[in-house]
């Protein structure tokens, strides 16, 4: 997985150099990088990071949310685990859910913050936050995406909309 992240980082760095020459076609690799990162985070091997085994145990034992088995997992994770367990017992279903929403919110926020240097923003995100938010602390990924969108709303004076984003997160 580390080599895949490094490869995507190198491709993103190259695209950030070439971005001014790409015109409107830059959105195609932008979306492809987003999809690749979603699949990479959502389909990772359980045990590759410190928290995935805990998430897998909590996913399989969602019925014991208040028990010592899961260690007091938050309610949204328990509800999502119950929903996805109805369809499959594979923990990657919830990994894909969190990766999809976390990365989609962040990539949408990046396009709202900047129109010209999107690949540079993605490159910085990959360097500092991707592995932490989307791979290790998966629930934090959605909250940080909502937080980025809330900052824009606060800057535009729409505090109620910002509060809504934070409440969703």
Give names to the regions the model predicted.
Residues 1-37:
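Start-transfer (signal-anchor) and selected internal transmembrane alpha helices
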Residues 24, 28, 107-127:
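Transmembrane-helix signature of polytopic, membrane-embedded enzymes
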Residues 53-89:
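Short hydrophobic/aromatic helix or loop-helix immediately within or flanking a transmembrane segment
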Residues 87-104:
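Loop-to-helix entry region of an early transmembrane alpha helix in multi-pass inner-membrane enzymes
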Residues 100, 141-151:
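Alpha-helical transmembrane segments of multi-pass membrane proteins
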Residues 130, 161-169:
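Membrane-interface alpha helices of multi-pass inner-membrane proteins
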Residues 135-141:
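Short acidic/glycine- and proline-prone juxtamembrane loop motifs at membrane-interface regions
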Residues 147-161:
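Membrane-interface transmembrane helices that cradle and orient dolichyl/undecaprenyl
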């Amino acid at each position: 997985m580390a080599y895949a992240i490094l490869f995507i980082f190198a491709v993103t760095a190259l695209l950030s150099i070439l971005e001014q020459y790409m015109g409107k076609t830059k959105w195609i690799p932008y979306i492809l990088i987003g999809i690749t990162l979603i699949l990479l985070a959502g389909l990772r091997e359980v045990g590759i990071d410190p928290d995935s085994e805990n998430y897998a145990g909590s996913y399989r034992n969602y019925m014991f949310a208040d028990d010592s088995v899961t260690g007091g997992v938050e309610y949204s994770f328990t509800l999502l685990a119950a929903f996805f367990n109805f369809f499959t017992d594979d923990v990657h279903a919830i990994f894909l859910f969190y990766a999809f929403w976390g990365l989609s919110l962040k990539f949408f926020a990046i396009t709202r913050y900047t129109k010209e240097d999107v690949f540079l923003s993605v490159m910085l995100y990959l360097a500092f936050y991707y592995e932490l938010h989307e791979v290790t602390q998966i629930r934090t990924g959605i909250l940080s995406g909502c937080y980025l969108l809330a900052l824009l709303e606060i800057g535009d004076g729409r505090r109620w909309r910002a509060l809504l984003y934070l409440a969703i997160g």
